[in-house]
Amino acid sequence: MIKRALISVFDKTGILDLAKFLESRDVEIISTGGTYKHLKENGVKVIDIEEVTGFPEMLDGRVKTLNPLIHGGILAIRDNEEHMKVIEEKGINPIDMVVVNLYPFFNKVEENLSFDEKVEFIDIGGPTMIRAAAKNFKDVVVLTDTKDYENVIDEIKENDQVNIKTRKKLAGKVFNLMSAYDAAISNFLLEEEYPEYLTLSYKKNIDLRYGENPHQTAAYYTSTVGKYPMKNFEKLNGKELSYNNIKDMDIAWKTVCEFEEVACCALKHNTPCGVAIGDTVQEVYTKAYECDLISIFGGIVAFNRKVDKETAENLAKIFLEIVVAPDFDEDALEVLKNKKNLRVIKCEEKSTEGKDMAKVDGGILVQKSDNKLLEDTKVVTEKSPTEQEMKDLIFGMKVVKYVKSNAIVVVKDGMAKGIGGGQVNRIWAAKEALDRAGDGVVLASDAFFPFGDVAEEAAKWGIKAIIQPGGSIRDEESIKVCNEKGISMVFTGIRHFKH
């Protein structure tokens, strides 16, 4: 039976209901600082922790609960006669429940505060108490999540106690929380790209219906610190997002964020099927749609500008899973909401420079994100691209980096007319892209040409300019073909493999 509880919380949500319930069952409540004041002002009978420890709060609140009279009461094993004898001799009363949530370091680390101010939000007393309570979960109930209050109240009402299964789960939540909390602090202090231990701090956002396929369970976790597009978006309409939806939305959003110009990306199965830039949202959607009239069906469409009513009306004509944009005109949103299953996503955060991670069996690969488009751009052929061709070449290179390797993109007037990707050799990717395009002006490749065959194939389809990293031992073969066919070719010096 719970006879004594210690309550010390930063987040006061639900704490009055819990405290008043405990009080109604004659539980003695000990509290600290702001929590003590909050409970007392709201009519809860509460004991200041100083009355228990006989020691005042000190060092600007850094030392409040770090005291044997507190931790002895938490850690004493009730059925250990020696433990109980010691705490009785020392005048220590057992503490049966610990209710603590931590200083909000996750939030404060991203605020415009000085380094020293952020350090002050590293909680010490709270973690020490909850770790102690979690270790002794057979005798102590520990609550760190406001969502657990109601369940614990119900169990006590029904059984006069909290069952051991619940206690164990609550203890597990402590160490789960602390691993994320400590990871955030560690990353803040270390500021290392590749630390000795990789500790990640993510919190479950939602349980997903399933993973890539219906037989796979899944959940979505978001970073506890920082602002990121796939963390801070807002769903304005439609069904719940799926595992595949979120993966696809991420790539579609990253693609349109590559461009300063008005841009649209249509995407299916994590691969762009239509990308375009232009002067208006309606123009770029029309161009992206025309890139691939078939594949866009059931796909995702992303914009880097606000969507207007005219564009929304056109979007509503076909089946789409998601439309994502920085914002939507009110009348545009009304149109899209008529399709109750269409997920309409408002995403204002730009795609961020950071790291990419890939899980393998027994490890995680970590790398810097591919945020560098060009290295040492130079024309390597007798003929140079025109100004418009050069614009299309750069556009093509921005698109091709989001297509699975081997990847080729054929472009005409700011429109990715043909996209070939995921092929095990480059010539197949080129043939796929050229065939899909039908006609095009320039061709972009994510990696160098190992032979002259891609240039030969491009010439057959009337390509006028090519952009590729260069660096093959047979570069001269491709250069020779281009010179013979009157094609200009640009080397960028940087590769964009995507696996």
Swiss-Prot record:
HAMAP family listed in its UniProt record: PurH
Alphabetically ordered keywords of this record: Hydrolase, Multifunctional enzyme, Purine biosynthesis, Transferase
Lineage: Bacteria, Bacillati, Bacillota, Clostridia, Eubacteriales
Alphabetical list of PANTHER family matching this protein: BIFUNCTIONAL PURINE BIOSYNTHESIS PROTEIN ATIC (PTHR11692:SF0), BIFUNCTIONAL PURINE BIOSYNTHESIS PROTEIN PURH (PTHR11692)
Family membership: Belongs to the PurH family.
Gene that produces this protein: purH
Name of the protein in question: Bifunctional purine biosynthesis protein PurH
Entry remark concerning the domains of this protein: The IMP cyclohydrolase activity resides in the N-terminal region.
Protein's UniProt keywords contain Hydrolase: yes
UniProt EC number: 2.1.2.3, 3.5.4.10
